[in-house]
């Protein structure tokens, strides 16, 4: 299945959007199972089970660390661990049982859905 984890807010915060527009941050997208894997890696290394919404940031931080390792750099990597995953144990159980799946949405279906949205002034 699909796990809609975290804070149930799947939009973009205005401040985060503005920081991206200014080029201060980059947006990254990862499949849910890769994020769960990153959360498990973090838990095993740090002893903290991350909240599911934090796993996306953990995944990005791990990817940045691997990039630094490949490039021989010692960059500082900052990410937000928004909370613990103690209330998310059933989702972790589903992950370990192989019940979660990654889905790829068809670009044509996405374009059709977006075309049906009303125009909103900026």
Task: Say what each PLM segment does.
Residues 32-96:
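Claisen-condensing/thiolase-fold acyl-transfer catalytic domains that form or cleave C-C bonds
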